[in-house]
Amino acid sequence: MRENKMKIRKLDQSEHGKTRSLWEQVFSEDSQEFVDYYYYIKTKDNTIYVIEEDDEIRAMLQLNPYQVKLQESVVPSDYIVGVATQAEYRGRGYMRNLLIHALQDQYSQKMPFTFLMPAAEAIYYPYDFRFVYEQKQIELDEAFFSARKEYKNDEYRNISQERIVDRDARFMDAGKMAAFVEENFSDCWNVVVLRNAQ
């Protein structure tokens, strides 16, 4: 009888697309448009570690490269994303093995630090990850937009109200959004991820 062996390896860039089906299984809430964008743009220059068993990818961890501004210095860093294991292979320590392997590689490359946005903070606490910020999210309801539209139709409308444009961001807007954040907010923080058009 053949023994099933778990194998950890870093994929060649040409193999990155092999992880897409696992992404779609585990992160089923992601839209088709987002997954298309991610696998067309982000996987061009990222690093993907996988665990294979029976010659199939069973788990993955992706590292997306970013430049991070630490006060006045700019340093390379990786954002851990796409940590996923097929449902029937969970509970075998695959995530732990991938994380340790990736962090050891980063250490040998003298990567100053890495970051992530965990589904649950407790998952990564044993690996010395610590909470550094809380992401604020604001939802504007239909009443906000309706009131603004009624007000815009008024002859005495406020000029500042006219500056608000509500539409979905497009891929071509990414560069402008990154420049806006850099120009208006980067001086407010000691640590900030430098954004670009991608």
Regions from the PLM with identified roles:
Residues 108-112, 118-136:
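Conserved active-site alpha-helix within GNAT-family acetyltransferase domains
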Residues 131, 135-198:
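Amide-forming acyltransferase catalytic core, primarily the GNAT-like/NAT-type
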Residues 1-5:
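Short, Lys/Arg-enriched N-terminal segments with co-localized hydrophobic residues
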Residues 80-90, 119:
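A short, internal acetyl-CoA/4′-phosphopantetheine-binding micro-motif in the GNAT/acyltransferase core
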